Amino acid sequence: MSTNHLREFRESLMISKTELARKANISSITLTRIEKGKPSRMKTQRKIILALGLKISDKNKVFH
């Protein structure tokens, strides 16, 4: 499992899981798996980072 702070970051922005999944164009199930620490593709991480309004260079704020 990979370490990430996605859930905490998402909640700090007061964004629901459903809303973030929609913005990132991924399924809610995929987002749930990632928040639980399951591995994810770089492409999926990129979608999430951009949907959160971050730059790709800010990846470490969410994913480690």
Which residues does each predicted region cover?
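The alpha-helix within a helix-turn-helix
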Residues: 10, 21, 49
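A short, Lys/Arg-rich alpha-helix, primarily the initiator
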Residues: 1-13
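Short alpha-helical DNA-recognition segment
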Residues: 14-32
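Residues that mark the N-terminal boundary/hinge immediately upstream of a DNA-recognition element
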Residues: 5, 16, 41-44
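DNA major-groove recognition helix of helix-turn-helix/homeodomain DNA-binding modules
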Residues: 42-60
